[in-house]
């Protein structure tokens, strides 16, 4: 996750669920090379939720509340067991890309995933992985790393993969999606956040 501006991805999940689409996020505690913000980091270190051993309890909460967060260590212990070797690897391993598209929990109906990439080229590997996944629809957008927040302050490319069909590409332009006043507020807010980073 990106640390220089507020992290809204964690709070987007209950909002999506409130809009009628059950949603969950999965993550582990931060890993190198960036040690960014993760759902698990917020749960454990901010909200004081027990880190592991409560996977079934979290799944029950998702079923009851239609949203929640899964600890990758509970869902995929073999992946969590690679933590020490991942800490020794300086560069970002291929696992960091693959683990975004894991499906530790499957919906009764159709399953969708929305994720982002920051560096160009990752959209190709993510949509190709999407073709081979169990997800019915994979949505990959150019935006902030580690979130489902597409770059509304600029034109964002979104790629939609439905099963084995050809990948569709869409452009999102905040200036065309929002009224002029709202678009101006988005641009001003983004500029203000950039000043905070400095």
Language-model features: locations:
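Active-site cofactor/substrate anionic-group-binding motifs, chiefly glycine-
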Residues: 1-25
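Short, contiguous, pocket-lining structural segments
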Residues: 4, 8, 31, 35, ...
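Short beta-strands and strand-loop turn motifs
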Residues: 24-27, 110
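Acidic, glycine-rich active-site loops and adjacent beta-strand->loop/helix elements
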Residues: 27-34, 144-145
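Active-site-proximal loop->helix
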Residues: 31-47
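Glycine-rich anion-binding loops and their surrounding alpha/beta cores
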Residues: 44, 49, 63-198
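Phosphate-binding loop that captures ATP/GTP phosphates
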Residues: 50-61
